[in-house]
Regions:
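Short, well-ordered beta-strand elements within core beta-sheets of diverse protein domains
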Residues: 230-236
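Internal mixed beta-strand/loop scaffold within catalytic domains of large alpha/beta enzymes
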Residues: 97-228, 370, 382-384, 390-392
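C-terminus-biased signal that marks the final domain/tail of proteins
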Residues: 2-134, 140-142, 237-273, 277-398
Length: 398
């Protein structure tokens, strides 16, 4: 057995606050690690941690409107981790707080934000690397790649989900596997960051969900439902069809920022749902597969796309993913082995689906495939590679 992220199982029959408190106590180190990581990332954009918390508090009302139980649950998370509610809110609103272009051109604002963070006792972890320039290229790198296969495209007649989560390697120690439940008792398992409600995971009913970050020109402009709250809400759904209904309801409250949510269910259906403050749409499978990276594919949302850096690898990774999906057209149906090969694809070097850390970039700022995840909703099975997938095995955790 290789290293695996800590597994936290929440006790049965707890109130929202008690669930959060138990989660917070069990993941206090990971939540505090996340706070330090994101305080520095926000500061790079000219946003101090105090300012980030103030921005996050604007989302309280819309979160309560969607699910009144989540605010007391987050208060419990904060108390358990020896943090404040606004800290937990800021972590769960991190996609909305980061500006659409991620990196501010105002270096003076970044410097002031760093001074404010230092005064709060928040360490600058980039000083262990290259200080001033350590994070400069982080925002130009790509992020996650996903591939979902429906019942017609799979080797066993069931839908499969796969994704690499690419981010700053520093966040790997903050990852945990959480098994919890909502106010109606519907259980779920999620691979998430300390201090965050949910990320990639599966509901007890057999809906697998993931996340590819997108950037919209209207991200964070008005308080809509935060992306990570959307993910937690969808983990109460049992199917792709039910997720569509949930997204239609969330749209009445508006989405806080853009993301793509790849999904697969126990009945064999898959899709990708692109969400943004301007609306949402669906990418349907072609020849049994749906592939996504980090730019909008739906024509109806093309005007939402924020400009991307020239070095962003979203398009090369999409092409690589489509190459794997094309095997279905040639009669080569996709199963567990093929999805492992997909998530370990290094054919495009540092722009690959499986991203190894770039040795030319300071260690603390390297974007890499932090983890890989494969899910089979039919059997509620989850496999996780807790490092760059090329380096480790996929271990079954559920």
């Amino acid at each position: 057995m290789i290293f695996m992220f800590p597994l936290i199982k929440i006790s049965k029959s707890l109130s929202p606050y008690e669930r959060g408190l138990e989660f917070g106590k069990a993941s206090a180190l990971q939540a505090q690690h996340s706070r330090i990581t994101y305080a520095r990332l926000f500061a790079t954009c000219g946003i101090s941690w105090t300012a980030a918390c103030e921005r996050a508090e604007r989302y309280t009302q819309v979160i309560e409107a969607l699910d009144p139980a989540l605010i007391p649950e987050m208060q419990g998370m904060a108390d358990g981790a020896a943090l404040k509610l606004e800290d937990i809110l800021a972590l769960n609103c991190r996609t909305e707080i980061l500006p659409p272009n991620f990196l501010s051109d105002e270096t003076q604002e970044a410097a002031l934000a760093l001074v404010a963070n230092t005064a709060m006792g928040l360490p600058d972890w980039t000083l262990e690397a290259d200080g001033e320039n350590a994070l400069k290229d982080v925002w130009k790198e790509g992020e996650c790649t996903s591939l979902c296969v429906n019942a017609l495209g799979s080797a066993d007649g069931h839908a499969w989900f796969s994704q690499n989560w690419d981010w700053v390697g520093r966040q790997r120690p903050a990852l945990i596997v959480l098994q919890s439940y909502d106010e109606q008792g519907r259980t779920f398992t999620t691979l998430t960051e300390g201090g965050m409600l949910a990320k990639i995971g599966m509901s007890k009913g057999g809906l697998a969900i993931g996340l590819n970050i997108l950037r919209s020109v209207t991200d964070g402009a008005t308080p809509g439902v935060p992306v990570h709250v959307v993910l937690r809400h969808l983990l109460s759904c049992q199917s792709v069809a039910e997720a569509r209904l949930a997204l239609a309801h969330i749209q009445t409250l508006k989405f806080g920022a853009a993301s793509n949510i790849p999904v697969a269910d126990a009945m064999g259906e898959v899709a990708c749902f692109e969400i943004s403050p301007g609306g949402w749409d669906e990418v349907k499978p072609v020849d049994g597969c749906v592939v996504h990276t980090n730019h909008f594919l739906c024509e109806s949302l093309s005007d939402q796309q924020s400009p991307m850096g020239l070095a962003l690898s979203s398009t090369p990774r999409l092409i690589s993913g489509l190459r794997h999906a094309a095997a279905v057209k040639q009669g080569q149906l996709i199963g567990f082995e093929e999805l492992q090969n997909f998530l370990r694809d290094e054919s495009d070097g540092l722009w690959s689906i499986c991203r190894s850390p770039d040795p030319a970039i300071p260690p603390e700022a390297r974007v890499e495939s932090v983890a890989g995840i494969i899910m089979l909703p039919h059997t509620r099975s989850i496999w996780i590679a807790p490092n760059v997938p090329k380096l480790v095995a996929f271990e079954k955790i559920a």
